[in-house]
């Protein structure tokens, strides 16, 4: 599982001209699932996102977690995080999980974030989405348990 985390001032996701998820300050998470993932990766990454300290304290040091700043999460499924561009000019997605498995683990990831006390908005799994965001920093991190 890969999570591309972006610290944002605001973010939203629109499907067919309808806003299906929107947040104020917090994280936009682009979440990709591979066929080798289990609930172990799901829980590890959700807990990592919850505890990661990338918000600035009074001394402008990254020392606060999303919980510390009462931030929100917009979680968007993103199978293209597993695009392989080593051969040719078109990415191959053979490392991405099949949709049924990916959706199950993506939902478990979001449930774990909620169980950790976070407000989580989502996109719509498998849909074509327009994602809008205002980066904060910018701070962008790629998280992966077995990188």
Curated annotation (Swiss-Prot):
Its EC number is 3.1.1.96. It is an enzyme of class 3 (hydrolase). One of its GO terms (cellular component) is cytoplasm. It is found in: Cytoplasm. Pfam families: Tyr_Deacylase. One of its GO terms (molecular function) is D-tyrosyl-tRNA(Tyr) deacylase activity. A motif (Gly-cisPro motif, important for rejection of L-amino acids) lies at residues 137-138. GO terms for biological process: D-amino acid catabolic process. Keywords: Cytoplasm, Hydrolase, RNA-binding, tRNA-binding. It catalyses: glycyl-tRNA(Ala) + H2O = tRNA(Ala) + glycine + H(+); a D-aminoacyl-tRNA + H2O = a tRNA + a D-alpha-amino acid + H(+). InterPro entries: Daa-tRNA_deacyls_DTD, DTD-like_sf. A Gly-cisPro motif from one monomer fits into the active site of the other monomer to allow specific chiral rejection of L-amino acids. An aminoacyl-tRNA editing enzyme that deacylates mischarged D-aminoacyl-tRNAs. Also deacylates mischarged glycyl-tRNA(Ala), protecting cells against glycine mischarging by AlaRS. Acts via tRNA-based rather than protein-based catalysis; rejects L-amino acids rather than detecting D-amino acids in the active site. By recycling D-aminoacyl-tRNA to D-amino acids and free tRNA molecules, this enzyme counteracts the toxicity associated with the formation of D-aminoacyl-tRNA entities in vivo and helps enforce protein L-homochirality. Belongs to the DTD family. Homodimer. This is D-aminoacyl-tRNA deacylase. It comes from Exiguobacterium sp. (strain ATCC BAA-1283 / AT1b).
């Amino acid at each position: 599982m890969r999570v591309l985390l972006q610290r944002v001032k605001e973010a939203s996701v629109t499907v067919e001209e309808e806003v299906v998820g929107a947040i104020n300050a917090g994280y936009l998470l682009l979440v990709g699932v591979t066929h080798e993932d289990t609930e172990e990766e799901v829980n590890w990454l959700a807990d990592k996102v919850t505890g990661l300290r990338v918000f600035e304290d009074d001394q402008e040091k990254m020392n606060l977690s999303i919980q510390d700043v009462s931030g929100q999460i917009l979680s968007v499924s993103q199978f293209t995080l597993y695009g392989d561009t080593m051969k040719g000019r078109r990415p191959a997605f053979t490392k991405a999980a099949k949709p049924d498995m990916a959706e199950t683990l993506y939902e478990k990831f979001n449930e774990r974030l909620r169980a950790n006390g976070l407000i989580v908005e989502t996109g719509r799994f498998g849909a074509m989405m327009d994602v809008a965001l205002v980066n904060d920093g910018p701070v962008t991190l790629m998280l992966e348990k077995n990188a």
